[in-house]
A protein has these predicted regions:
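Beta-strand segments within the central parallel beta-sheet cores of soluble alpha/beta enzyme folds
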Residues: 51-61, 87-91, 115-120, 172-179, ...
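Conserved beta-ketoacyl condensing-enzyme motif
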Residues: 27-100, 106-107, 111-132, 285-307, ...
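Active-site-proximal alpha-helical scaffold in enzymes
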Residues: 90-121, 153-188, 227-233, 342-365
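Short, well-ordered amphipathic alpha-helical segments that serve as non-catalytic structural scaffolds
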Residues: 32-48, 72, 99, 155-159, ...
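Short glycine/threonine-rich loop-to-helix capping motif typified by GTGT followed
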Residues: 64-71, 258-262, 295-317, 345, ...
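Condensing-enzyme catalytic core mediating Claisen C-C bond formation in acyl metabolism
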Residues: 4-32, 141, 165, 176, ...
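Conserved catalytic cysteine-centered active-site region
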Residues: 63-114, 122-154, 193-219, 252-254, ...
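Long, well-ordered mid-to-C-terminal structural blocks that present hydrophobic/aromatic surfaces
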Residues: 262-299
Length: 405
């Protein structure tokens, strides 16, 4: 099997355009129209590349409610004016993170020069029971659902196990994640929950699944996101594009059921995906300037700090309390607001993370712009950890020198 480093030795791939819809509730939109808007915005940011330049597309969606599951990929690309071969990727919440990975593979291997990758989801028109069902199928459907377990309940088990294993951790640490991400989301014009919350707001909110409260859980969301992945030759031929190099991509799978895995206080697939991405990029956690991580529930962000190597096991609460992951900290995490405040349109989430990385690395983040970041990391998880993908982007276009850390 080709190693991550050998894969990195193939031709380079670049993200040269990225766009997304607002995330929220849009009863007058369809999954087709949302994705078309994201494609329009990605192409508008791509410095002269147009629909005629796209060789193929890879898209991700869960298909909440069962809408157009069989051919939703071609349905959205044809509606968006892209008559190209289209593949739909399914990996629960990691669907479009994997779509981006597949696009990178196609470009790096030489199978394509320009690939559009993205995702979409419409969730807010579904009833609560329908949403619970479709989130539940991201877990182990025969046994976890048989016991009445919900998606929130599964992560609550992880949260309780973390509190029991690491005595210094408290429920207030979950609330600190919410406070940070709501503050970031309040400044993001695309975010669903554009308001701040206090520690008391988060800790005293209604319990969803003990010990998780409402503010420890992401919302249900409609939205779409898309990015253009191109070869180094295409990037060099279009000097007006703002390019970020795909330095590394790592992916891993695991047993789908939480009860089938050896630990409740880590997501091994995230750890393995990160190791592969770091190896391919020839970099380390210390080189990462900012990250977008999969905070579907507050406990998931704390686990991500540890799974991605930002700190040792059990030290995530300390990292958070010390402000390291704040917007003005040493390692800002979820400056977009994360899934918690930006929103979690399942199939669009992974691509949306790449949109944020591209904006920050190319200076397109507006008032939210970080101070000269060079390396960004996106972390996207499917279910409770049955799949994970980690993508590392670096500042700099084809032929440009990317400064070292």
């Amino acid at each position: 099997m080709r190693s991550a480093r050998e894969a990195g030795a193939m031709r380079d791939a670049y993200v040269v355009g990225a766009g997304q819809t607002d995330f929220g509730s849009f009863p007058d939109e369809s999954y087709r129209s949302l994705f078309a808007t994201a494609v329009d915005r990605a192409l508008a940011s791509a410095g002269g590349l147009g629909r005629e330049d796209v060789d193929e597309a890879v898209v991700g969606t869960l298909g909440v409610g069962g809408r157009q599951l069989g051919l939703s990929g071609p349905a959205v690309t044809e509606f968006a004016g892209l008559s190209v071969p289209t593949t739909r990727v399914e990996n629960a919440c990691a669907a479009s993170g994997y779509a981006v990975r597949n696009a990178v593979q196609a470009v790096k291997s030489g199978m394509a020069d320009v690939v559009l990758a993205g995702g979409y989801e419409v969730m807010t028109d579904a009833s609560g029971d329908t949403t619970k069902y479709w989130l539940g199928v991201s877990g182990e459907t025969e046994w976890e659902r048989l016991t009445g377990a919900t998606f929130a309940g599964t992560y609550a088990q992880m949260a309780r196990a973390y509190l029991d294993e690491h005595g210094a951790a408290t429920v207030d640490d979950f609330s600190r994640v919410a406070v940070k991400n709501h503050a970031n989301g309040s400044e993001n014009p695309h975010a669903q929950l554009r308001f701040e919350c206090s520690l008391d707001d988060a800790s005293d909110a209604a319990t969803v699944a003990d010990p998780l409260t409402l503010y420890h859980c992401c919302p249900t969301t409609d939205g779409a996101a898309a990015v253009l992945v191109v070869s180094e030759e295409v990037a060099a031929d279009h000097p007006d594009t703002d390019a970020a190099r795909v330095a590394g991509v790592g992916a891993a799978s695991d047993r789908v059921g939480l009860f089938e895995r050896d630990t409740y206080t880590a997501i091994p697939a995230s750890e393995r995906a990160a190791e592969s991405a770091y190896e391919m990029a020839d970099t380390s956690p210390e080189d990462v300037d900012f990250a977008e991580v999969h905070d579907c529930f507050a406990i998931a962000e704390l686990l991500a700090y540890e799974d991605l190597g930002f700190c040792e096991r059990g030290e995530a609460p300390e990292l958070l309390r010390e402000g390291v992951t704040d917007r003005d900290g040493r390692l800002p995490v979820n400056v977009s607001g994360g899934l918690k405040a930006k929103g979690h349109p399942i199939g669009a989430t992974g691509a949306g993370q790449i949109v944020e990385l591209w904006k920050q690395l190319t200076g397109h983040a507006g008032d939210r712009q970080l101070d000269d970041p060079e390396v960004g990391l996106a972390h996207n998880v499917g279910g409770s950890g049955g799949a994970a993908v980690v993508t590392i982007l670096e500042e700099g276009g084809a032929g440009q020198e990317v400064s070292g850390k």
